[in-house]
Every structure is written in C-alpha cells, then in structure tokens.
C-alpha cells in the first residue's frame, strides 16, 4: 500500500514533463538515431533496455561507449551487478531519480530501447502482482516451454490466450502469480499503478525484414570483433559457468558453453545467437503492436530515415515549445 501511495505521488509530480520514447526491436538502429536526435535538440538519453542495467555485460548488450554515456548524459545503464536480479519496479524507481535530476536542470529526456515492459511501466503503470517466488521460479526454470505451457493450461487456462506463450519467462511469471496468489495474472494486470509520465510522444521504428536480418547478423559479428568471447570468459572467471548460464542476456550462455565445451564451431555459434536474437526481435514486435500510443515508422531507405529524424525533431521541439518553454532545446 505504501508503494502504491509513493508511486501515485511520483506520477503526479512527473505530469506534464517533457519525455519522449524511441523504441524498436534489437539491432534495428535505435541508438544511432537517438544520438542524432539528441545532437540536434539537446536531449538527455535514458536507456530502456532490460539488459543494459547490468554492470559488466557491455559488449553483448551493445551498451553505448563511455564517451557517449557522458556526452548524452545517459541514464538506465549499469544499475546493478550482472549476477543480481532486477525488475520493472526497480527500473521505474531508478528512472524516477534520473528524470527528476534531468528535469531539475531543465532538460528533456528521450528514452530509447527495446524493452516493452519498461515502456509500458513508464507510460501505462505497473502491475501490482505479487513479487517473484524465488523457490518456485527456480523449479520452473528447469522445465522446457512445452511442460510450462501444459502447467499453465491446467491451472489458469484463461491466461494461455493472453500470455506470450513463445516466451518461457512470461509463462513462468503467469504460473508463479497464479500459484502464489490464487489469482490470475490477467486480473492483476487490471490493477495497475498510475503511469510515470503523461503526456508523452512515442516513436516505434522498424526496417524491412531483409535489411533487419542483415543488420542483426552484422551486429553480432561486430560484437565478436570487439571481444565478446573475452568478456564472457571474464564473467566465467568471476562468477563461474553456473552464473553465466543464468544470465538472461542473449549470447553469454552459448559463448560460455562454446569456450568451455567446444560444442560448436564459430559459425554455428554465431548462427545460434542470431536465431535467439531474431526470435527476441519478433517477440518485441509482437509486444509493440499492442501499444496504442506508439507511432509506427518503417524506415525503408536512408532518405526515409533522414525524413523520420527531421520529423521527430520537429515534433519534439513543438511539444517542448508548447508545453515547456523553460526547458532547454
């Protein structure tokens, strides 16, 4: 109850402040576009990437460089140790502090990333469902997706049509909530807190499928060139292979197995990571399609990308001029 009151107070304090969103699936080019927008209009950047919150997961999560983090006054990065747990509520708490600091300095914020849950938490509120049951979650994480789906169907059939059943983590959460509280996650979702920011502008960028796939493959190769294997080896030396296998960021577990067991050759390893990231990108698109506040832009060529950036800058500048003349831009 205390958390609910605090969240309500925060939402009231943050009403009518300049915040904007640029979202899209992994590898689509969000960060580069966000930097171009920020250069033109002087915005600070908040990462809404669910993996960039973890320290030491740098290359595999495509974090901005240290110089870029300083230049664009980044928030939402390196919030917790890579072995720690993190969730949307903790992210919103951190985002509150960051936004308050930037707004105090009269700077607008562009939130950029691909985590649909973080976007929803900031713009539509948080679900008040019970926290994670670690003992039950450990048990469920040992099961494959089909077994999890059968269990959810048995205990909460109404949730099956609602939950993203291609994502084991979503199935686990639905099972966990139902078995812990006796109430379906669907019912809990109806009892959300107030949104963190309102009003806001939100842009969803996408690429034609062939180009998106090429970009994703190129991105993975560049990560290996930058030292992804060496980064993973450092994590294994620090926390052991068991900790790396529990890491939720795509690629680290596969690379760890490759380094220690040589299960695949390098090409097979890159292809396995690509398949996982491609599947994640599809799930991201599915999520964003359910967000009515997003303005969708398909960037078919460099000219359309340029026009999008120009239009985005104009819309943001107009929004600030109309509502926040005391803010910098």
Swiss-Prot record:
EC numbers on record: 2.5.1.75
Region (Interaction with substrate tRNA): 49-52
Residues annotated as binding ATP: 24-31
Single biological process term from Gene Ontology: tRNA modification
Keywords of the record: ATP-binding, Magnesium, Nucleotide-binding, Transferase, tRNA processing
UniProt catalytic activity: adenosine(37) in tRNA + dimethylallyl diphosphate = N(6)-dimethylallyladenosine(37) in tRNA + diphosphate
Top-level taxon of origin: Bacteria
Reported cofactor(s): Mg(2+)
Residues the record lists as binding substrate: 26-31
Pfam family, one: IPPT
GO MF term (any one): ATP binding
Disulfide cysteine pairs (residue numbers): none
Subunit-level organization: Monomer.
HAMAP family cross-referenced by the UniProt entry: IPP_trans
PANTHER family (UniProt xref): TRNA DIMETHYLALLYLTRANSFERASE (PTHR11088:SF60)
Function: Catalyzes the transfer of a dimethylallyl group onto the adenine at position 37 in tRNAs that read codons beginning with uridine, leading to the formation of N6-(dimethylallyl)adenosine (i(6)A).
Family label: Belongs to the IPP transferase family.
Protein name (Swiss-Prot/TrEMBL): tRNA dimethylallyltransferase
Species the sequence originates in: Methylacidiphilum infernorum (isolate V4) (Methylokorus infernorum (strain V4))
Organism lineage string: Bacteria, Pseudomonadati, Verrucomicrobiota, Methylacidiphilae, Methylacidiphilales
């Amino acid at each position: 109850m205390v958390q609910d009151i605090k969240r309500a107070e925060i939402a009231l304090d943050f009403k009518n402040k300049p915040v904007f969103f640029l979202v899209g699936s992994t590898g689509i080019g969000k960060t580069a576009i966000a930097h171009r927008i920020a250069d033109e209009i002087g915005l600070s950047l908040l990462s809404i990437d669910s993996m960039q919150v973890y320290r030491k997961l740098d290359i595999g999560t495509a974090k901005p460089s240290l110089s870029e983090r300083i230049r664009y006054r980044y928030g939402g990065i390196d919030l917790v140790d890579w072995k720690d747990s993190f969730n949307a509520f903790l992210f919103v708490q951190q985002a509150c502090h960051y936004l308050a600091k930037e707004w105090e300095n009269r700077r607008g914020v562009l939130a950029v990333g691909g985590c649909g849950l973080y976007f929803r938490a900031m713009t539509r509120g948080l679900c008040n469902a019970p926290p994670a049951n670690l003992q039950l979650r450990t048990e469920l994480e040992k099961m494959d997706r089909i077994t999890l789906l059968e269990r959810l169907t048995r205990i909460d059939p109404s949730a099956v049509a609602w939950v993203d059943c291609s994502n084991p983590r979503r199935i686990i959460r639905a099972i966990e909530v139902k078995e812990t509280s006796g109430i379906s996650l669907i019912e809990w979702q109806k009892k959300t807190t107030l949104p963190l920011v309102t009003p806001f502008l939100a842009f969803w960028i996408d690429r034609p499928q062939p180009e998106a796939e090429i970009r994703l493959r190129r991105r993975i190769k560049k990560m290996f060139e930058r030292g992804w294997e060496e980064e993973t080896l450092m994590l294994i030396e620090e926390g052991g292979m068991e900790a790396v296998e529990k890491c939720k960021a795509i690629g680290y577990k596969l690379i760890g197995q490759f380094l220690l067991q040589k299960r695949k050759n390098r090409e097979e390893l890159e292809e396995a990571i690509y398949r996982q990231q491609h599947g994640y990108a599809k799930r991201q698109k599915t999520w964003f399609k359910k967000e009515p506040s997003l303005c969708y832009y398909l960037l078919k060529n460099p000219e359309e990308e340029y026009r999008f950036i120009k239009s985005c800058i104009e819309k943001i500048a107009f929004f600030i001029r109309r509502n926040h003349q005391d803010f910098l831009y």
